[in-house]
Every structure is written in C-alpha cells, then in structure tokens.
C-alpha cells in the first residue's frame, strides 16, 4: 500500500491533473430544485471555475453550449466545451442522435458525449448499436471533434461491460483510421442512472479496469463518483485519459493544498 501511495505522489509531481478533468454540471433546474434563472447562474459559475482553474473541459447541457462559448472566448481561455447527446437514457434513434450532435457542433462544442443505446445492446440488437457508433462517430470525426461513447456501467453486468466496450472498440477499428483512435473514448457513466441505495452508479476501479482491458487502443473516460484528489490520481494511474466530475475544483484544490507532501 505504501508503494502504491508513493507511486501516486511521484505521478502528482510529473503531470498536471487539470489536463484530465472534464468539469461537469449536467443538472436541469428541476433536478437541482432551482428556478431556471438560478440554474443558469450555477452553470455560469461552473464555466467560470473551469476558466479560472484551467480545466481541460467544461461539460454542460446542449442548450448551454453557446453560453459557454461566449464566456470562454471573452476570457480568451483554452478550456474546451463538451456536451451530452441523447442524454441520459440513450434510447433515441440514430437520427435523433445525429440531429442533436449537429446542433451541438454548430454551436461550438468540441467534445460530443453520446449515450449509447445500452438497452438495445442488452436485448441483443447488436447491429443497431454498431450503426449508431459508425454513423455518429463519423459525424464527430468529420468535424474534428472528440467523440465519447457512454456505456452506463451501472446498468450492465461485468460480462456486458466487457462485451459493449469491445464492440465499440472493434467497430471503430473496422471503420476508422488508426490516427483517429485517440479521438474516440469509451466512457463509463452518465451519473444519472438510478441504482439501489448504496450501489455506485458511476465509475468504480473494478469497472474501469474492465473497460481499460477491453478498450485499447481507444482511451477511457471515468465519469461519475470520482470526487477526491486521491481517487482522481488512482484513476489516472490505472490508465484513464479523462475524468468527468462535478468535483473538479475540490480535486484541484486538494492537489494544491497537498503539493508540499
């Protein structure tokens, strides 16, 4: 255990954790129990924090992309903008996903995080899922965007996590060039899947290991449940390339306060 902690401490001094963080705010006003005006203020605060702390990306709802673009350009910041497509259930048709993605692209999104139709996958509709991956990934890559496929690990058993991760990987390898692989992620979770009390609905070390073992050469994004500096470092140590979290500020603040140790 001591060696593992020492390794993490070494890693903390050789990389900037902010480059891994997709600072995330995806609650609607109703979900946050706020008015629309109050919720937009929360969104603005999240965007400003991403700018201030120089996170890799701010992840917000599609109807907030233009706002993020305006604030980031005004600040002359390098923070990129991500949004979610067919969120959070992923049950929409290819056409629905494409339409949402086209609007997000037009509004200035850099990353497109699609929720895959995991329910169709569970039911055995493999070709339908493959077609989603092919068509939507092509749209994103043709517009020089990063594409991420959310598989919703909390809805899957271990065997299904392995199968769906491998399906995305094999589909991308079969239809896109090697230079594009690093631009197509497999992502763990929406953070909105309802689980029994006490059961995690996001990334766990166990599920991320399964994804990493079966996604290569595609990168993995751990999303949901990563809330501390130590957890973020451990995920990076495992091999994830991005971390989606609503606790990005706390993660970085912890890093700053612990930097002398």
Residue ranges of model-derived segments:
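Conserved N-terminal beta1-alpha1 strand-loop-helix module at the mouth
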Residues: 12-94
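Catalytic cores of alpha/beta
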Residues: 94-101, 157-166, 226-239
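Glycine-rich phosphate-binding active-site loops on the catalytic face of alpha/beta enzymes
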Residues: 107-120, 176-197, 226-261
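Glycine-rich anion/phosphate-binding loops
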Residues: 89-103, 123-132
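Conserved anion-binding
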Residues: 111-183, 191-194
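Alpha-helix-loop-beta-strand connector modules within alpha/beta enzyme cores
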Residues: 69-86, 127-148, 166-172, 200-221
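Hydrophobic faces of well-ordered beta-strands that scaffold small-molecule active sites
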Residues: 19-23, 27, 58-60, 81-85, ...
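Alpha/beta catalytic cores of nucleotide-metabolism and tRNA/nucleoside-modifying enzymes
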Residues: 13-41, 138, 210-218, 226-261
């Amino acid at each position: 255990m001591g060696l593992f902690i020492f390794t993490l401490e070494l890693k903390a001094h050789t990389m900037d954790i902010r480059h891994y963080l997709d600072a995330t705010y995806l609650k609607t006003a109703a979900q946050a129990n706020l008015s629309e005006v109050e919720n937009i203020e929360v969104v603005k605060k999240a965007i400003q924090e991403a700018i201030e702390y120089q996170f890799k990306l701010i992840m917000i709802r599609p109807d907030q992309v233009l706002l993020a673009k305006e604030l980031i350009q005004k600040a002359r910041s390098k923070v990129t903008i991500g949004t979610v497509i067919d969120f959070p259930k992923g049950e929409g048709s290819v056409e629905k996903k494409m339409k949402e993605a086209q609007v997000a692209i037009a509004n200035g999104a850099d990353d497109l995080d699609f929720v895959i139709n995991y329910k169709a996958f569970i039911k055995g509709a493999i070709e339908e899922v493959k077609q989603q991956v092919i068509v939507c990934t092509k749209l994103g890559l043709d517009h020089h965007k990063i594409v991420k496929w959310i598989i919703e690990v909390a809805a899957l058993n271990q065997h299904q996590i392995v199968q769906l991760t491998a399906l995305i990987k094999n589909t991308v390898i079969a239809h896109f060039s090697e230079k594009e692989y690093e631009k197509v992620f497999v992502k763990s979770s929406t953070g909105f899947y309802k689980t029994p009390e006490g059961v995690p609905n996001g990334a766990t070390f166990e599920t991320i290991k399964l994804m990493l073992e079966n996604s290569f050469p595609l990168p993995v994004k751990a999303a949901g449940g990563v809330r501390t500096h130590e957890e973020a470092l451990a995920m990076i140590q495992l091999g994830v390339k991005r971390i989606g979290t609503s606790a990005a500020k706390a993660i970085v603040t912890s890093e700053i306060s612990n930097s002398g140790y």
